[in-house]
From Swiss-Prot:
GO terms for biological process: chaperone cofactor-dependent protein refolding; DNA replication; protein refolding; response to heat. This is Chaperone protein DnaJ. PROSITE patterns: DNAJ_1, DNAJ_2, ZF_CR. Its main location: cytoplasm. Keywords: Chaperone, Cytoplasm, DNA replication, Metal-binding, Repeat, Stress response, Zinc, Zinc-finger. Zn(2+) 2 binds at residues 163, 166, 185, 188. Belongs to the DnaJ family. Signal peptide: none annotated. Binds 2 Zn(2+) ions per monomer. It is found in: Cytoplasm. The J domain is necessary and sufficient to stimulate DnaK ATPase activity. Zinc center 1 plays an important role in the autonomous, DnaK-independent chaperone activity of DnaJ. Zinc center 2 is essential for interaction with DnaK and for DnaJ activity. Its cofactor is Zn(2+). The keyword Manganese does not apply.
Length: 378
């Protein structure tokens, strides 16, 4: 008895997201769970079928194999035994080699036109743009469906015909001794169709080079490495097949003031010696404008001040980061003689017996150095 298609089992489309697959599985697993249907053999069989489909479609490698080869791609018993006298070697090797030359035979059916390629666009943003969000106009070079032949590749009023060599499969079987392998049909070049009267605009390709402009909404809070997917905005598919997707890859330029780490922002704020010693208020830049920061008296250089809620709003939640300001005490330069004299007088007031009280860190350091050399010489 042939197995049902896993997507059919879970009642989801072939392009369903992992979240949609999980949601469908949860609903069906609860419906058919043996504990809810004691003694019901059919419900038990349905539960096992749903579980099997879920395990395959939520495993990236198994899902890729299933999408490409069907149940044969995930059958652990496939390929381990010998071949019977009537075995069709084309089925076995066609599954493996078929994709290399443009798709498997899919049970003898006609070759399906290839989906359009995905595109990548590298978008550089300023920190302000990344934090606030905006709408960007992007000009994308791509392959678009030919508007003269509607993507068929054939001149208007005509249609492609099925290839007589491969009968629309896009492949022919070549036997080499014991083995049989599939290769691209030399007549239609793997397309499965022959265009006897090609379109003058696209020359039978069904697609033409074109640039299009898209308005892309960049959400607030994006960061380096974030990727935005625009479904169906990639290259047009081959001969009317679905288009690919466009992926916008975000990078953020370095800022002259702020450094971003996750949702937090960091900056260094210079303060004067007198401000650090006596305390006071200083202006600090934020992405929303200047704010005042209170500096306590006797603040040491390198001290970090946290301003809550002044960072970046997360792109994935309502959380907002903080702004962390590191104060750096600046040594005054280009002093005149009067200023130097005042500093010398001030320095004299700090020396002597009261120096430990005014500079505890310095005194502790020099006491440690003194002890180090005493121990070294003892």
């Amino acid at each position: 008895m042939s197995k049902r298609d896993y997507y059919e089992v879970l009642s989801v489309s072939r392009d369903a997201s992992e979240r949609e697959i999980k949601k469908a599985y949860k609903r069906l697993a609860m419906k058919f769970h043996p504990d809810r249907n004691p003694g019901d053999k059919q419900a038990e069989a349905n539960f096992k079928e749903v579980k099997e489909a879920y395990e395959i479609l939520t495993d990236a490698d198994k899902k890729a194999a299933y999408d490409q080869f069907g149940h044969a791609g995930v059958d652990p018993n496939r390929g381990g035994g010998g071949f019977g006298g009537n075995a069709d070697f084309g089925d076995v090797f066609g599954d493996v080699f078929g994709d290399i030359f443009g798709g498997g035979r899919r049970g003898g059916g006609q070759r399906q036109a290839a989906r359009g390629s995905d595109l990548r666009y590298n978008l550089e943003l300023s920190l302000e743009e990344a934090v606030k969000g905006l709408t960007k106009e992007l000009r994308i070079p791509t392959l678009a469906a030919c508007d003269s032949c509607d993507g068929s590749g054939a001149k208007k009023g005509t249609s492609p015909t099925t290839c007589g060599t491969c009968h629309g499969q896009g492949q022919v079987q070549m036997r080499q001794g014991f083995f049989a392998v599939q290769q691209a049909c030399p007549t239609c070049h793997g397309r499965g169709k022959i265009i006897k009267d090609p379109c003058n605009k696209c020359h039978g390709e069904g697609r033409v080079e074109k640039s299009k402009t898209l308005s892309v909404k960049i959400p607030a809070g994006v960061d380096n490495g974030d990727r935005i997917r625009l479904s169906g905005e990639g290259e047009a598919g081959e001969f009317g097949a679905p288009p690919g997707d466009l992926y916008v890859q975000v990078s953020v330029r370095e800022h002259t003031i702020f450094v971003r780490d996750g949702n937090n922002l960091y900056c260094e704020v210079p303060i004067s010696f007198s401000k650090a010693a006596l305390g006071g208020e200083i202006e600090v830049p934020t992405l929303d404008g200047k704010v005042n920061l209170k500096i306590p008296a006797e603040t040491q250089t390198g001290r970090m001040f946290r301003m809550r809620g002044k960072g970046v709003k997360s792109v994935r939640s309502h959380a907002v980061g903080d702004l962390l300001c590191k104060v750096v005490m600046e040594t005054p330069v280009k002093l005149n003689e009067r200023q130097k004299e005042l500093l010398r007088e001030f320095d004299e007031t700090l020396t002597g017996s009261s120096s430990k009280k005014h500079s505890p860190k310095a005194e502790g350091f020099f006491d440690g150095v003194k002890k180090f050399f005493q121990d070294l010489n003892s």
